């Protein structure tokens, strides 16, 4: 298993110290400055990939709405760490596929081939704001957009004609550095999406939020089974990516009492409660009745404070502890088939210096032991 990082660029917790808009500006600037410093340090420490999300309108949760700009800056200020789009929102209402081909390839050129390209459809709250269909048409758009992007990369000139989109023959530039193109991933929150990723030859990006490791393992098994049955003619790309990446909150500390004193557990609790609050307010009203019935029982108890932080810890939904304790939990993820653990390290009100120390501990005491265990998947394969 390899250790990655995932950044949503979450501003420090409200209330901010100054009135609007100055408090928001200050909080977001600080978030960016600290995150970039952490990523540059992780590059030196030997972390594998940093993934930057694309989110829109995520009040207090994410200030990362333009991941290509962040990754372009990181391409010029890091030297080893891979740069992950985590993920590009692909339905046509968000962006034209030609723009996706351009921005992903540009970061790949700037970084000399360090891009990992994650793709997804987003959530109803974001889709509605951009005029994206809230039904399965967004899935069709997502798939079609990937075909278009890869076609642009692979051909000197390219044209497209379909019910959803048409454009005349044009040359897309620049082409990506990697040959034939960067590996492609699919964000998957359900078993159905995990199966889709396996069938299409895409890497799987998932999470361990509000579900025990055993439940996550079911998604991975469904992905692996679909992958084993996949036919070359069904692949969306020329790079077969059979890796699994999973994200969760990760923090390593020297001393548990000290960590409690600097607010570690309050930050975990806030992060989960804010997730529940945001989802129930902005996402739930836009879901189908069946989806609401599935989501509401999970989130309302979290919002009401009925789920103690110890529950997440005991179920290994989060990876927090000394370096040795973190390693023990990480090995559980390794054993169920996770190839890359996306460590979500900037959350709540964690002090920047403690995040930096956590990165040090993981690099010194966890990464070498994971390397010694070996890797199921060393690279993607061209087809």
Please give the residue ranges for each predicted region.
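Acidic (Asp/Glu)-rich catalytic clusters
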Residues: 43-44, 72-80, 104, 108-114, ...
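Active-site mouth loops of central-metabolism enzymes
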Residues: 17-32, 88-98, 178-188, 250-253, ...
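Conserved, mostly hydrophobic/aromatic
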Residues: 46, 54, 74, 107, ...
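An alpha-helical appendage that flanks or caps ligand/catalytic pockets
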Residues: 5-9, 136-172, 214-335, 373-383
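Glycine-rich, proline-tolerant flexible connector loops at the mouths of alpha/beta enzymes
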Residues: 49-70, 89-91, 123, 209-211, ...
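Short, well-ordered coil/turn segments that N-cap beta-strands
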Residues: 1-3, 47-49, 78-83, 110-116, ...
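N-terminal beta1-alpha1-beta2 module of alpha/beta enzyme domains
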Residues: 1-77, 81-83, 181-182, 380-383
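Flexible, glycine-rich active-site loops centered on histidine and acidic residues
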Residues: 2-30, 90-160, 203-217, 264, ...
